Swiss-Prot record:
Post-translational modification: Undergoes morphogenesis-associated proteolysis which cleaves the 28 kDa to a 25-kDa product. Proteolytic cleavage of major core proteins P4a (OPG136), P4b (OPG129), and VP8 (OPG098), which occurs at a late stage of core formation, is required for production of infectious mature virions (MV).
Primary subcellular site in the record, as a coarse category: virion
Gene name in the database record: OPG098
Any Gene Ontology CC annotation: host cell cytoplasm
Domain of life from the UniProt record: Viruses
Induction: Expressed in the late phase of the viral replicative cycle.
Family, similarity comment: Belongs to the orthopoxvirus OPG098 family.
InterPro entries: VP8_pox_nuc-bd
Site (Cleavage): 18-19, 32-33
Propeptide positions: 1-32
Identification of the protein by name: Core protein VP8
UniProt organism field: Vaccinia virus (strain Copenhagen)
Function per UniProt: Major core structural protein.
Record GO terms (molecular function): structural molecule activity
């Protein structure tokens, strides 16, 4: 499936998450290119979570994790091949926490989407680009760990010439072109779906607690697109009202 999710954004690529300027950076991409992970809004920014590293991992925390995922109901239905079957809360959880998924990148409290650079286009230069298209049904999924998990960072001063597997049952704070995300490895063994939220046509969030509410929401898609500025406001609202994990990082 293309990294640009259908029914999630407009036809053109509207963002880029940095270019590959060095061979080492190319290796970093290769280190995660074959990883299996659930597609989400982060795929728009060409974020491919890595399953290997050439740095030593340093333990920085052992705690419970709460993180977020943005996607659309269409994306999940399409990836699950549901056809005319109804999308349920159980199906959403099974999609993200499929045992075949090696890694799941999560938005956390110090994930800053303003670091994203709008891609220049010869046809249009509108910086307030569309994130979720009119007619789509975007959702916000909140995940949390069942118990405390070790959180690591890469020691950039300990580079090796070879890549080694990061391993299972751990989390790694990673940065992709200025965007901090928390990668959780073997998420099916440590994570659970805590809540699902839909987007109202007033750019607010509403909790979807039952399959009936989920079905009702899917039958009332967005009447207007959600653009970058509105999305950034929604993300800040999420951070203020949902205690996402905060992991301070040094650039």
């Amino acid at each position: 499936m293309s990294l640009l999710l259908e029914n999630l954004i407009e036809e053109d690529t509207i963002f880029f998450a940095g270019s590959i300027s060095e061979y080492d950076d190319l290796q970093m991409v290769i280190a995660g290119a074959k990883s299996k992970f659930p597609r989400s809004m982060l795929s728009i920014f060409n974020i491919v979570p890595r399953t290997m590293s050439k740095y030593e991992l340093e333990l920085i925390h052992n705690e419970n994790i709460t993180g977020a995922m943005f996607t659309t109901m269409y994306n999940i239905r399409n990836n699950l091949g549901l056809g005319d079957d109804k999308l349920t809360i159980e199906a959403i959880e099974n999609y993200f926490l499929d045992p075949n998924n090696e890694v799941m990148p999560l938005i956390i409290n110090n994930t800053d989407m303003t670091a994203v650079i709008p891609k220049k286009s010869g046809r249009r230069k509108n910086k307030n680009m569309v994130i979720f298209r009119q007619g789509s049904s975007p959702i916000l999924c909140i995940f949390e760990t069942r118990k405390k998990i070790n959180i690591y960072k890469e020691n950039m001063e300990s580079a090796s010439t070879e890549y080694t597997p990061i391993g299972d049952n751990k989390a790694l704070i990673s940065k992709y072109a200025g965007i901090n995300v928390l990668n959780v490895y073997s998420p099916s063994t440590s994570m659970r779906l805590n809540a699902i939220y839909g987007f109202t046509n007033k750019n607010k969030l509403e909790k979807l607690s039952t399959n009936k509410e989920l079905e009702s929401y899917s039958s009332s898609p967005l009447q207007e697109p959600i653009r970058l500025n509105d999305f950034l406001g929604l993300l800040e609202c999420v951070k203020k009202n949902i205690p996402l994990t905060d992991i301070p990082t040094k650039d």
